């Protein structure tokens, strides 16, 4: 296995994949899993309701989005890894965010959920065989491999950590 290449994913995922380090999925876990978890674990409660501009997501909403999206990407990964050839639909992240109001949730509970979700995803990725990683399917109208989905999952999280650090006054 090597890093995903053009044709293994929709071009809109290129940025996510570019944020990752590693040439095989297990290297993604060793290179990124701990940093992602430590960053999320370190978000203080007083920052949870902060949004950097009117109409932008709060950190709490961002975390909910990250969890929802990871679950969707993992579902795609399992679907394709298990050989189901049917195309998977896309999703509207803003509609999902509006339908899953996070403002009532306790940040500590969200962090715990995120940590458990991340660990579950890592265990799933570690269990994949080369045959499963090579499986190809379609999601959101674009071809995607299971291998590419591993990179997309990590890259999506890294993208949002970068956004939080850059725009959410998080130091």
Residue spans for each PLM region:
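Terminal targeting/low-complexity segments that flank the catalytic cores of oxidoreductases
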Residues: 1-34
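Acidic/histidine-rich alpha-helical segments that form the ligand environment
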Residues: 27-41, 96-134
């Amino acid at each position: 296995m090597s890093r995903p290449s053009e044709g293994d994913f929709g071009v809109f995922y290129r940025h996510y994949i570019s944020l990752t380090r590693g040439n095989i999925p297990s290297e993604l876990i060793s290179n990124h899993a701990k940093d992602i978890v430590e960053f999320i674990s370190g978000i203080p409660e007083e920052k949870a309701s902060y949004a950097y501009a009117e109409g932008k997501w709060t950190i709490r909403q961002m975390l909910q989005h990250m969890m929802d999206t990871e679950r969707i990407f993992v579902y795609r990964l399992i679907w394709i890894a298990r050989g189901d050839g049917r195309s998977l639909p896309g999703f509207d992240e803003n509609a999902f965010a509006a339908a899953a109001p996070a403002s009532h949730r306790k940040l500590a509970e969200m962090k715990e959920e995120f940590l458990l979700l991340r660990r579950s995803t890592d265990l799933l990725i570690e269990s994949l065989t080369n045959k499963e990683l090579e499986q190809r399917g379609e999601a959101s109208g674009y071809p995607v491999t299971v291998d590419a989905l591993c990179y997309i999952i990590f890259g999506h999280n890294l993208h949002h950590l970068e956004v939080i650090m850059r725009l959410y006054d998080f130091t």
